């Protein structure tokens, strides 16, 4: 496991990025200067409009979201979002082969 030094920015993958915990964690990490990759399938377990509103707050426009493609935040240069399903093994392997978290 890598040691994290004080004042070192992290690169973090957050699953459930549009949910309550994921959204607030994203905001906190972005506020301290970390690089955040948000991942969410945007299912209808609860209000989908609330999930999209949270994504809008971090600069991800609903109409720019494309399945299995990263969307760059218009507010935070250090935030990208991808709509994908954690059960899509091929897509998850692709994400981890392209980036190191």
What do these predicted ranges mean?
Residues 1-101:
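N-terminal Rossmann-like NAD(P)+-binding domain of SDR-like oxidoreductases, especially those catalyzing
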């Amino acid at each position: 496991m890598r040691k994290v030094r004080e004042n070192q920015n992290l690169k973090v993958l957050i699953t459930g990025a549009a949910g309550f915990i994921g959204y607030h964690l994203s905001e906190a990490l972005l506020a301290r200067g970390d690089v955040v990759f948000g991942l969410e399938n945007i299912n209808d377990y609860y209000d989908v409009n609330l999930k999209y509103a949270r994504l809008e707050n971090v600069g991800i426009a609903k109409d720019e979201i494309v399945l299995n493609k990263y969307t760059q935040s218009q507010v935070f240069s250090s935030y990208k979002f991808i709509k994908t399903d954690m059960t899509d093994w091929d897509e998850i392997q692709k994400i981890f082969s392209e980036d190191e978290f």
